[in-house]
Amino acid sequence: MLEAVEIIEVSPRDGIQNEKKLLSLDSKLELIDRAVKAGASRIEVTSFVNPKKVPQMAQADEICAALPRDTNCQYIGLALNRRGFERACNAGLDEVNFVAVASDTFCQKNQGMDTDSGLKLFNDCLLYTSPSPRD
């Protein structure tokens, strides 16, 4: 029997990444604020990707710098490569998520590498991380 279910709000990242009209920084922060006020305890706020490929994620660093820290909410960023991982680690987030892709074709299209390279990168980044919590 399942003892608990954890819901992660992903609309500030996944919900807007394919939108044609670019959202302002204020609009993105308002979306996050509304999720916090609605009771979300974990929010994937952005993705640290190339803004030329995903223009909606161009303000990842600015979003993280403006997040309210007086909440019980955990903020999460998505990283697809080492540069994104390093940016996410420096952004003051509570957590960095990775994507593990089963298909080489999709992994190449989404992350610019094959699945084995993606898993190796994930492992390398795990070795880099520290178990100490954010101050």
Regions found by a protein language model. Give the residues of each.
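Catalytic cores of alpha/beta
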Residues: 83-90
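Alpha/beta enzyme core
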Residues: 28-42, 90-98, 134
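Glycine-rich, proline-tolerant flexible connector loops at the mouths of alpha/beta enzymes
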Residues: 42-63, 101-113
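Conserved small/polar residues in nucleotide/adenosyl-binding loops
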Residues: 128-135
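Hydrophobic faces of well-ordered beta-strands that scaffold small-molecule active sites
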Residues: 6-10, 43-45, 75-77, 96-98
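Alpha-helix-loop-beta-strand connector modules within alpha/beta enzyme cores
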Residues: 54-76, 117-127
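Active-site beta-loop-alpha junctions enriched in small/polar residues
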Residues: 13, 48, 78-83, 101, ...
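Active-site mouth loops of central-metabolism enzymes
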Residues: 12-27, 75-81, 109-112
